[in-house]
């Protein structure tokens, strides 16, 4: 198996409104206060990873997107039962957030109209150095856009809105015994479960591999390492500082992710 994890970004305070995130590297802690440097970083090359999230209950001007950049299945307002409506609205919001991130990154929004699906049904752009990934859970949607100036870009993202589950039983379905033993000792089983689940999902989604391969990803929580045959080497992010649990994989070292949320009128 290939080692893909060189570092992890962790936040595990229960205070959901906190913005600073902590980067856990090998042997040292480094702190990045994103809001303080966001404007400056827009003008330097290392600003390559953009993450935006929003809730479908908040209004967003989907009609401002040029019609030619919208796939046919998103042109009409979602209708049907509540679950179908929720899912379609999440897709519209994801498309809108990706449009916003392309503009924020100074990248051509024409890419939005060129999205195609791979053989594994993963949506992506027709250019190798720019990749994106989308996840939604409940009414929440998150989008990651990554631009790599020197090589092929590969990213994956997973969000999970907290809900009551039999975490131990679920762990037994995909985690080896050693990881289950570690999980049983954690004081916050919910946070520990979503860490194990979301990190795996993010890795697999970067290559369009489904959760059927979840158990093939090896997670060593004490060593902060993940091994997988389905992903290139890179770094992972995990946090519970947002309104949901969040994990992302980026095939780049020393990543500098910048988070935005939609506040009804603009990304903040």
Feature locations, PLM:
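Hydrophobic alpha-helical signal peptides and transmembrane signal-/tail-anchor segments
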Residues: 9, 22-23, 40-44
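Intrinsically disordered, low-complexity regions enriched for glutamine and histidine
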Residues: 7-10, 17-18, 87, 233
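Feature targets compositionally biased, intrinsically disordered low-complexity regions
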Residues: 14-16, 24-26, 40, 112, ...
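Positively charged N-terminal leader segments that act as targeting/secretion signals
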Residues: 1-2, 11-30
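Ala/Thr-enriched low-complexity intrinsically disordered regions
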Residues: 6-7, 28, 36
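Sequence-pattern detector for short linear motifs
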Residues: 5, 19-22, 33, 203, ...
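Core catalytic alpha/beta fold that binds nucleotide/phospho-ligands
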Residues: 43-268
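Short, Lys/Arg-enriched N-terminal segments with co-localized hydrophobic residues
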Residues: 31-46
């Amino acid at each position: 198996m290939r080692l893909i994890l060189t570092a992890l970004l962790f936040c595990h305070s229960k205070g959901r409104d906190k913005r600073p995130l902590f980067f856990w590297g090998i042997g040292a802690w480094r702190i990045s206060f994103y809001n303080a440097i966001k404007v400056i970083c827009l003008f330097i090359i290392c600003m390559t990873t953009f993450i935006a999230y929003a809730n479908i209950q908040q209004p967003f001007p989907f009609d401002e997107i040029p019609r030619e950049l919208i796939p046919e299945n998103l042109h009409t307002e979602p209708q049907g039962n509540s679950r179908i409506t929720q899912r379609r609205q999440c897709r519209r919001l994801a498309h809108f957030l990706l449009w916003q991130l392309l503009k924020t990154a100074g990248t051509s929004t024409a890419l939005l109209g060129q999205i195609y699906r791979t053989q594994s049904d993963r949506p992506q752009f027709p250019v190798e150095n720019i990749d994106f990934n989308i996840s939604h859970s409940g009414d929440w949607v998150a989008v990651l856009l990554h631009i790599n100036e020197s090589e092929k870009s590969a990213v994956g993202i997973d969000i999970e809105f907290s809900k009551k589950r039999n975490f131990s039983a679920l762990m037994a379905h995909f985690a080896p015994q050693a990881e289950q033993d570690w999980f049983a000792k954690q004081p916050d089983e919910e946070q520990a479960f979503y860490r194990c689940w979301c990190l795996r999902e993010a890795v697999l989604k970067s290559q369009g591999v489904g959760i059927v391969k979840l158990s093939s990803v090896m997670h060593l929580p004490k060593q902060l390492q993940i091994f997988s045959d389905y992903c290139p080497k890179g770094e992972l992010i995990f946090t519970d500082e947002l309104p949901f649990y969040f994990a992302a994989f980026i095939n780049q070292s020393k990543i500098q992710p910048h988070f935005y949320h939609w506040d009804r009128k603009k990304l903040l």
